[in-house]
């Protein structure tokens, strides 16, 4: 299996949600499996998104410490340039997205990573950007 860039939506489900639905529990187990196999990739912008909005200092510190297990994959100038290209391409087709989402797409594309996400926006990006998104069938079974 190749390396997986895990999107903020998955991390948020794993770290913040108290009660998981059956499909979310399967996704959590899949994520744990990827972590154990050392297939998970982290980038700084995802780390920032995960940590943003946590007003409780103790919870912030605990989550920050938990995430220290994952070093940040280095983002290159080419990644930033391609993210801008993806943004422009998708926007011209009427698809809106965040700058960080397009950066995730770019880093994944440039480094042959798959993306694990719960964010349906990535399906819209995939129509115009060559990215590999892990299908639910891979973790629901």
Task: Briefly describe each language-model feature range.
Residues 1-42, 52-64, 139-141:
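Short, well-structured N-terminal submotif of metal-dependent ribonuclease cores
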Residues 6-8, 46, 118:
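A secondary-structure boundary/capping signal
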Residues 36-38, 66-70, 93, 111, ...:
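Structured helix-beta-strand junction loops
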């Amino acid at each position: 299996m190749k390396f997986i860039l895990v999107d903020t939506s998955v991390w948020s489900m794993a770290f913040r949600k108290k009660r998981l639905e059956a499909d979310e529990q399967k996704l959590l187990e899949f994520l744990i499996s990827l972590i154990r196999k050392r297939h998970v990739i982290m980038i700084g912008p995802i780390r920032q998104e995960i940590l943003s909005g946590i007003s409780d200092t103790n919870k912030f510190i605990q989550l920050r410490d938990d995430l220290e297990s994952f070093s940040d994959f280095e983002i290159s100038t080419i990644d930033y340039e391609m993210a801008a290209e993806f943004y422009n391409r998708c926007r011209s087709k009427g698809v809106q997205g965040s700058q960080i989402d397009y950066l995730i797409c770019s880093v994944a594309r440039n480094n042959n990573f798959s993306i694990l996400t719960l964010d349906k926006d990535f399906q819209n990006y995939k129509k115009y950007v060559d990215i590999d998104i892990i299908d639910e069938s891979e973790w629901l079974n």
